[in-house]
Amino acid sequence: EAVANDNNWNQQIKQSVINAWSNAFDTGNYGPYNDVFPQVDWWDELVKPGFSQQYNVNISGGTNFMRYFASIGYQNDGDIYDLQKQENFDPRNYYRRYNWRSNLDFNLTKTTSLSVNIAGKMGYRNDNFADDVYTRIIAAPTNSFPIKYSDGYWGDGSTAGYNPVCNMNTNGSQLYKTFQGWYDVRLEQKLDFLT
């Protein structure tokens, strides 16, 4: 602090430290997993393009007596965070849905018809427990600590800032499962002969 108060900014960081960093950059001896010269672009390490997939298969047909329609579908909304499934839990955010529908229509007689409709969906949503991720990615220091040290321990964010990669991979997650099903049966009798 005294050096800063005296306006000796060139003495804030020792020349040997400046030279060491300069040499590290000149030789490429730095990076997100370098113990001595960490240089982490937290956004590039943690964020990737997201994706969404949707697939559907439909069949239909029939005769004068019976008509049918069946549909099955799958939707997968992937994660924008570059996370991998862990041994004990899955830190990735995603939503997966399976849906189905089946309609059967029968002409029992010229005036009587029967319809049976069945539909449903099953959903799986996985949410990461990490909070305020964007702010923490932007606020994390780029050269205070690596993502992980060479001994396998996470870069220490307790004194020099926050390690968002560690947080996203260790805070846990919750898997929500949902199921909804519908069915209806309709019998229709025309009563035109009464009028």
Where are the predicted features?
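N-terminal, post-signal-peptide soluble/periplasmic segments
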Residues: 1-34, 110-127
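Short N-terminal signal/transit or membrane-insertion segments
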Residues: 2-7, 142-143, 184
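Alpha-helical support elements that line or immediately flank enzyme active sites
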Residues: 61, 184, 188-189
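Short, intrinsically disordered, charge-balanced linker/junction segments flanking boundaries
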Residues: 191-195
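Short glycine-enriched, charge-decorated loop/helix-capping segments at active-site entrances
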Residues: 85-90
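Enriched - but not universal
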Residues: 12, 24, 45-46, 157, ...
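Flexible loop and strand-edge segments within Gram-negative outer membrane beta-barrel domains
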Residues: 33-73, 77-80, 91-163, 169-180
